[in-house]
Amino acid sequence: VTITIEGRQVKVRAWRYEIQGLSGHKVPVYFLDTALPENTPWDQTLTDHLYGGDSHYRLCQEVVLGMGGMALISALAPEEPVIYHMNEGHSALLTLSLLESGSQSGGATAPTEAEVEAVRQQCVFTTHTPVPAGHDKFHWDLVSKVLGPERAETGRASEDSSPFG
């Protein structure tokens, strides 16, 4: 899949691993990878390490996980899952992708309360670090730089009734 980071097209591939439970049921787990020759050397490092780098690097990683993960789910499954489960805040930008895809304007205008509520109904969030230090916070100027001003404003417009956790 391809995502946009700072106006650049970043290719993301997935590695599939199946976990088999005691009952024999298999659950696929996908690992996202940006170490592709068509990406810039810096973009290739985004999936090298978890919990590394400065705020800029971390936000770019969260774009890969949240928006890249959503793009992968959309590419693999012709029908959308009913519920999206986000573990910790690292994938929270998935909600912005959901908001854009469910928006009447395609994310070009501020989301309505009904659109924000529809995203809320599709999401489950689990945290294992229920303290402020366990959740990334990014300045709006950095968000605007990484996501682009229009996407950043979509998130800002829904901040008061945010599905973004």
Task: State each model region's role.
Residues V1-G165:
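Catalytic cores of carbohydrate-active enzymes across secretory and cytosolic contexts
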